[in-house]
Amino acid sequence: MRAEFELGAEILFQEFTMSINRQWLLAARPDGMIGPQNFTYAETDIPDIGDEEVLVKNLMLSFDPTQRNWMVDRPGYLPPVEIGAPMRAGSVSQVVQSNHPDFAAGELVQTTGCWQDYAVVTPGKGPMGVNKLPPGVSPEMMLSILGITGMTAYFGLMDIGMPQEGETVLVSGAAGATGSVVGQIAKLKGCRVVGIAGGEEKCRWLTEKAGFDAVIDYKSEDVAAQIAYHCPDKWDIFFDNVGGPTLEAALNHINLYGRVVLCGSISTYNATRPEPGPSNLMSLVTNRGRMQGFIILDYLPRAMEAIEQLMGWVASGDIVYAVDMAEGFNNIPATIQRLYTGQNFGKQLLKIADPE
């Protein structure tokens, strides 16, 4: 049984016991910027588990730009979230009850969960499966540098970008969880790295902490002019998280045999009408360039390759990462909005509860 509570713009949160499962449901598909109108708070009973199933309690949620794509009713690499269903999200959870021989109560796992306190998961199924956290790895590490964002940076740059020593790498969305790691891996591979980010604080962090050679502040600078200035010999790899006018500006400065890694297009996700594509795609032809998109789910069989390499770089201090941690179940809808307004600094996470 599900009970929903709404009071104008406010949500009425009630005291709950262990028998109640709080949820945030997708109430309406977004048209433009995501807002409170897209979600509804609900309460339901904690589900029972069947054979080979595991009941988990969600401790921490991941917020990722691609969640906007899961909310719209169009074909994608995952089915859209249904209206009236809990919103999908990556999570670190604790096993509460298990009918599966490989999982025991108390263990921490990473999975594709939802915006709710409790969930039933089936090991071996779902986009990400159900994976135990490696020893010594915290929930925030598992959902940031060692999770989807870190693996996206690693495989996108290494497999599609194929960096070579001495090349110039341009990164949009450079202060984000993925972009900041892309730039640091590129530096480790002997490349010169130029980032594009928004705001003085983020730009300073990228040069002073993450080791970028230069950063363009799109909020206060002419991006096209600054790309030309900071990439006088053009760029060899453009790792694009933003799309839109930034992609078009970058394509004017592609080097011979340059590679564009299409990771995301956050500047267009909340558009109310289709955004026009770049008008200068012929630059790929004249420069024999390559533009390729990718989905991290295709690389999951190689996940440990990325995790082991990233763990080593973090342990040695060669890679740093930032986490923007929100707290409180009631703050979930407001937290996802931070991604699309540029308020977050680093990987956006939200803590629901501590492990028991």
Where does each model-flagged region fall?
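Glycine-rich phosphate-binding loop and adjacent beta-alpha segment
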Residues: 245-319, 352-356
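Mid-domain Rossmann-like dinucleotide-binding core that forms the NAD(H)/NADP(H) cofactor-binding site
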Residues: 143-221
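Short amphipathic alpha-helix with an adjacent loop that forms part of the alpha/beta core around
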Residues: 223-232
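NAD(P)H dinucleotide-binding glycine-rich loop of Rossmann-like/cofactor-binding domains
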Residues: 89-94, 101-173
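Short, glycine/polar-rich helix-capping loops at beta-to-alpha or helix-loop-helix junctions
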Residues: 116-117, 198-206, 275-281
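Glycine-rich beta-strand-centered segment in the early N-terminal region that forms part
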Residues: 46-63, 72-115
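C-terminal capping/lid region of NAD(P)-dependent oxidoreductase domains
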Residues: 19-21, 318-325, 333-356
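Short, Lys/Arg-enriched N-terminal segments with co-localized hydrophobic residues
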Residues: 4-17
